[in-house]
Every structure is written in C-alpha cells, then in structure tokens.
Amino acid sequence: MSTPSIHCLKPSPLHLPSGIPGSPGRQRRHTLPANEFRCLTPKDAAGVFEIEREAFISVSGNCPLNLDEVRHFLTLCPELSLGWFVEGRLVAFIIGSLWDEERLTQESLTLHRPGGRTAHLHALAVHHSFRQQGKGSVLLWRYLQHAGGQPAVRRAVLMCEDALVPFYQRFGFHPAGPCAVVVGSLTFTEMHCSLRGHAALRRNSDR
C-alpha cells in the first residue's frame, strides 16, 4: 500500500489574517533580522529541547517530549515540524507527527503513523527572549498553511490546558471534549481543526 506523499516546507511569503499580530512583513526591511522558516532536522533537536524544557517545565513541570522523543520525530517525520530562525538562531518551533485515529490516545504521544491523515501537534514553544511578540501566533498560522498544503493531511489535532482553548480557537480549532491523555495530574481539552481553509490560503500564497 502506497503512503501519501508529504514534502518539507519551501520558502514562501507569509500571509496572515487580520487580528493575528507579529507579521514580519509589517516591519521595515532595514530593521528586520533575517527570518527563516524551515522544517527541522535531528541536528536541531538539542536547541528544540532547550526551548521546550524552559517553556514547559516553568509552567507545568512537564515537557511534552523528552530529548530522545524530539530526535525520534525529527528523524521519522521532519516534514511535520517547523522552526523559526532569526539570524540563524532557533527562536520558536512546532513538532508534529501523523495520527490515524479520530481521537488522541496515550499512544499518540510517542507514535508516528505514516498512513494517518491527521497532523498531531505535540509541542509549540517560543524562546523566552522572544515571547510576547506574537511569534507563537505567526508560527502556528504558518504551520497550518504548510500542513494544509500536504496531500496526506486533512486536519490538525492537539491537546491543551483549558486556559489555552481561546488562543487555539482563533486559528480554527474547535474543542472536541476532554482528552483521553493524562500527564501526571494534568488534564487537557482535545482540539480539532480542518485544514481545508488553510490549504486554500497556502495555494493562494504560492501564486
């Protein structure tokens, strides 16, 4: 059985809807640091984990992915990751994998299912020096455009704490109810997002 093709991100203009702050294009070119958006590789794993550890442990005491799991996903499915680099420095990232069930399970935390049609977003984090600048919003919008342009991917899914539900709703995610995944004493809401609209945005931006 053939596996649907998935490709890594190609450089393309970033188009953001109104209400999403932080578009690099709104800054003057002569003051804009060199920005690069690209899929991550295993060589980026240490930098990813450093940002993730600082971002998550300070808030919840847990990391979504340990260093070995970061390397695992960046080896198996780098095309489902996205990093934002400023002057060559990683400042924000998203790591995802494919999932093939309607809802997330405990297994979904560590598995990549190549035949899946769902992009499972495991982690989104921004370096502490670049927070409160809208970079998480820009990166998430860019990622959804990228994932929506993949023939194999039809929707995105993630789990988040209740306080973050309104943030993800701004990007087209809808609550699907309590998530079956539990991490320690933490519980989560599962969020689903159809990528059809994001695919259209990606096609238009490529013209």
Swiss-Prot record:
Pfam families: Acetyltransf_1. The keyword Ion transport does not apply. It is found in: Cytoplasm. Substrate binds at L124, M159. The modification Phosphoserine is found at S205. Keywords: Acyltransferase, Biological rhythms, Cytoplasm, Melatonin biosynthesis, Phosphoprotein, Transferase. The record marks H120, H122 as: Important for the catalytic mechanism. Pathway: Aromatic compound metabolism; melatonin biosynthesis; melatonin from serotonin: step 1/2. Acetyl-CoA binds at L124, A125, V126, Q132, Q133, G134, K135, G136, S137, Y168, Q169, R170. It comes from the Eukaryota. GO terms for molecular function: aralkylamine N-acetyltransferase activity. Residues 35-196 form the N-acetyltransferase domain. Its EC number is 2.3.1.87. CDD domains: NAT_SF. The keyword Chloroplast does not apply. The modification Phosphothreonine is found at T31. It is an enzyme of class 2 (transferase). GO terms for cellular component: cytoplasm. Induction: Exhibits night/day variations with an increased expression at night. Higher levels in pineal gland in early morning than in early afternoon (at protein level). It catalyses: a 2-arylethylamine + acetyl-CoA = an N-acetyl-2-arylethylamine + CoA + H(+). High levels in pineal gland and retina. cAMP-dependent phosphorylation on both N-terminal Thr-31 and C-terminal Ser-205 regulates AANAT activity by promoting interaction with 14-3-3 proteins. Belongs to the acetyltransferase family. AANAT subfamily. Controls the night/day rhythm of melatonin production in the pineal gland. Catalyzes the N-acetylation of serotonin into N-acetylserotonin, the penultimate step in the synthesis of melatonin. Monomer. Interacts with several 14-3-3 proteins, including YWHAB, YWHAE, YWHAG and YWHAZ, preferentially when phosphorylated at Thr-31. Phosphorylation on Ser-205 also allows binding to YWHAZ, but with lower affinity. The interaction with YWHAZ considerably increases affinity for arylalkylamines and acetyl-CoA and protects the enzyme from dephosphorylation and proteasomal degradation. It may also prevent thiol-dependent inactivation. This is Serotonin N-acetyltransferase. The lineage of its organism: Eukaryota, Metazoa, Chordata, Craniata, Vertebrata.
